[in-house]
């Protein structure tokens, strides 16, 4: 629950993509920086949508499409997936009767149309309904909930078709000021570009509020790297044409002790890598799940910039504890290198709960 979004049945939306997106934008109150005339929360983490329908695939129960709903811009971006919203899709499928509830745990097979990948959501069930309450805590999310384990199956090459889109573990990017930096381009669950914080002159433990006082330098630098990487990965013909959501850009650093956004001390010996990422035009207050899977995967691929800063413990166990502005979370990566790097699956735990079910009114209705 580091995200919030509406789950819409595909057959209730216009079949025409333009009409569909217009309806979703109206529903969220976009374009408007405050989304005052809709259900959007004026934050990238709350301006998300899921479109769901029964799947006709043998390996999936539901088809699920994720969209980033523009806030100030009249656009719905479908280029990538969201792990948090994926967890909610499993709960939604059981609530809607798309999947028969099986106690004590129901496995919902989700085909994500954004990445053409299957995700297994292991949802706890009691009395025929998803269990919502529990003692599993996620840093950055108030309270606790029932643990939902997500397994992203064969997540490599989600958008580019390759785990290493350029075939290299490191590439070089020349920044606008002429500096050259080493980056790693990896595509697992979502494509991302990784850069060391120290190579940009940062500690790596900076909190989102830092960008309010630096004149936009960090955000602009990361966006330059991100859009340059989009072209290098074949995701866009030019920097200007790059999706605002994909690829992710991630700034990584070695394990170190720091203060989280809520003032808690995150001990360096309890984590394996420190990372910061963007959420559209601002710094992420926590960390994207799909971006975390890609980060954990990159950290275990020998020779990447993330691998150069991750703990030796993570390399030995294939379990990566990633530290972000709000705290930390854990990933389990099943990675092989028999005839080249290959990710069999990636596991992460989330929570999800329904807030309401009802009717929303859009223009013309």
Identify the role of each PLM range.
Residues 2-365:
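A glycine-rich beta-to-alpha transition motif near the start of alpha/beta enzyme domains, typified by
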């Amino acid at each position: 629950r580091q995200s919030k979004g509406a789950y819409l049945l595909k057959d209730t939306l216009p079949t025409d993509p333009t009409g569909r997106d217009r309806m979703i934008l109206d529903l969220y109150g976009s374009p408007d920086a405050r989304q005052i005339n809709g259900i959007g929360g004026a934050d990238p983490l709350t301006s998300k949508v899921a479109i769901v329908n029964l799947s006709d695939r043998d390996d999936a129960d539901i088809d699920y499409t994720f969209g980033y709903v523009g806030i100030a811009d009249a656009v719905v971006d479908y280029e990538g997936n969201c792990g948090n919203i994926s967890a909610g899709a499993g709960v939604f499928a059981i609530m809607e009767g798309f999947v028969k509830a099986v106690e004590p745990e129901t496995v919902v097979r989700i085909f994500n149309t954004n990445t053409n990948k299957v995700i297994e959501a292991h949802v706890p069930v009691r009395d025929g309904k998803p269990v919502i309450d529990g003692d599993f805590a996620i840093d950055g999310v108030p309270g606790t909930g029932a643990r939902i384990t997500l397994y992203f199956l064969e997540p490599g090459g989600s958008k580019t078709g390759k785990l290493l889109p350029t075939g290299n573990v490191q590439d070089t990017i020349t920044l606008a000021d002429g500096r050259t930096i080493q980056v790693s381009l990896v595509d697992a669950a979502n494509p991302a570009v990784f850069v060391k914080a120290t190579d940009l002159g940062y500690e790596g433990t900076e909190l989102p509020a830092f960008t309010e006082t630096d004149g936009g330098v960090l955000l602009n630098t990361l966006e330059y790297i991100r859009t340059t990487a989009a072209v290098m990965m074949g995701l866009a013909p030019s920097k200007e044409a790059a999706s605002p959501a994909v690829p992710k850009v991630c700034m990584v650093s070695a394990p170190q002790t720091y203060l989280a956004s809520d003032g808690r001390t995150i001990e360096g010996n309890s984590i394996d890598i420190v990372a910061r990422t963007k959420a559209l035009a601002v710094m992420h207050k926590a960390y994207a799940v799909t971006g975390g899977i890609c980060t954990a995967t990159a950290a275990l691929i020998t020779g990447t910039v993330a691998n150069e800063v991750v703990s030796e413990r993570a390399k030995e166990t294939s379990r990566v504890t990633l530290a972000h502005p709000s705290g930390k979370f854990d990933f389990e990566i099943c990675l092989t290198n028999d005839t080249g790097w290959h990710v069999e699956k990636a596991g992460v735990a989330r929570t999800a709960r329904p807030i309401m079910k009802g009717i929303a009114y859009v223009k013309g209705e």
